[in-house]
Structure formats: C-alpha cells, structure tokens
Amino acid sequence: MRLKGNTKGKTMNVFISGGAKNGKSSFAQDLAVKMAKESGRPLYYVATMIPHDDEDRERILRHQENRNGMGFRTIEAGKNLSLALHDTEGVYLIDSVTALLSNEMFREDGSIYYSAPRKITAELRELCQNFDSLVFVSDFMYSDAIDYSESVEKYRKGLAEIDRMLAQECDAAVEMYFGFPTIYSKDEEVPEILRKMAEINEQTAGEEVQ
C-alpha cells in the first residue's frame, strides 16, 4: 500500500471487476466513500460513459440517483483521463474502464481505432503510478461462447489486457460474483477497509444488486 509524503491518510488503488448486475458499482461507490472519509480526501466520480441511446441515458440516470447524497463531485471524461484528473490528493471512482475503451476504439465516424487498448493501457498505468486513491470498475465479459465480429473480439481481448494490467498495478483487486466479493491483495493481509466491506456484503448477499 502506498503512502505519499503529504497524504491525509492511508490510501490504495483498487481494481473491481464483475458481470452485469453483480454489485460491482455499489461496492465501488461504497469503497470510494469509505476511502475518502477515512483519509479526509475529496471524493470524485469519473463518468466515462458517452450516451448513444435511451438505454445509455437511463443507465446514467440510475447511477446518478444511486450516488445522490454520497458526496461525489462528478467529472465527465469519456476520453483522455490524464487530462481530466488534477487533484492528486483526491479519491477517484472511475466508472468504467469498459466504456472508456469503447469510446476510444469505436469512433463517432464509424471507424475503429485498433490501437485503443494499447493507448488506454499506457494511460491508466501512468495514472496508477501518479495517483494513489483510484477505484477502477470494469465489466467481466469473457465467459460466453458467442461468435462475435472481428472488431468486437479485438475489443474484448483489449479489455482483458487492460484489466490484467490494472490487476497487477493496483494494490488490490476485487472480483464480484452475485454480490459476493473475492479480494486479491498485494499485501499479505487484505486491507481492513476491504475486509470489513466483504463481511458486510456477505451478510447482505441476496438483496438486489446492480
């Protein structure tokens, strides 16, 4: 776990992955809020989704309602996160890596930027090295056997490479499955804040997750 010279408290970078409706967003929000409260740092929500249809807009609205009253300052950044994050003492919830890659890879003019995974990997690795209170959220989408188009397969492979890098660079990684978190930590012991949250989640598992 890293500790900056002028930090207001212990911090960590965390990578959270899970399938749809597995509770990763709620877990990430609660974690970021607790990290900010315990460290006395400002709290930011980095919204990476660029809406393209009503379903996207409804999803964004639902997430906004869920965050209401939690103390987040919202930063909208569908691309170029390194230009949007300035406060190195802040706690940032970046939701999501999945949308970030999609924005960069599938262009508005219909073209496909196949180097997007490499660009995003380098950008997020640099953020991990320069910031010490980041919570990344990503969607797990590698378990089905559907035959996708070449571009979608390259997207899935690229996302997997980014996720792998984040799991290696972050202090801890969390895999969400039906509301149950499995925690992997670089330290010998799981950070207390994550351990306590896991215990709470186990007690409330079975309730509606998102």
Task: Give the ranges of each region predicted by the language model.
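Conserved P-loop
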Residues: N13-H86
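Generic beta-sheet signal
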Residues: V14-I16, L43, G90-A99, L134-F136
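Structured helix-beta-strand junction loops
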Residues: G69-M70, T88, N130, E169
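Charged, low-complexity C-terminal accessory regions
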Residues: L3, K8-K24, A32, E38-V46, ...
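Helix-adjacent hinge/juxtasegments
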Residues: M70-K119
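Short, glycine/serine-rich, charged loops/turns that create anion-binding
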Residues: A20-K21, I50, T98, M141-A145
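Residue-level signal for inorganic ion chemistry
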Residues: A28, H63, L93, D139, ...
